[in-house]
């Protein structure tokens, strides 16, 4: 799918940011090595916070007036958001909203702002977890900053297959997929595609753990 995209989108890059938690993608150097090990080096990859951060405004935000993103995001005028849809222990689900809310936020400041209880836009200490409701509101505001920045030049693709109740960040400890493969959804509306994905998961099996949990 990625190869096909790049054939039809001239001068495109895959964009990433480093992680907040220590691991194989914590630094730019280890991140690039991880991409290489996993065979994801057949296209240009821009680790957007490699050269620093930039603050994007959150218009009419409840918790944030602005949020920290990987600096290189401002080098782009459009974005295709490709997301593996799944569950999430704190956010309820991991869809396009979470993908851009966490995925575009830089690995130190922005991700800490979203995950922590921030005061005056200052990130909280790692591990000072907010309530699930606050985390989801933080993610919504971070995603809004990205959507507002790109305007009409952003499209979302949710892949509904091999869906676990756990986020991909759980790695090998993630629960085995419990929801039947459904297909691929595409939309220019962030809320519509994530809501449709949730509805399809719940309707696919009312007895699934995903449905009972979320």
What are these regions (language model features)?
Residues 1-214:
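Extended, low-polarity segments enriched in aliphatic/aromatic residues
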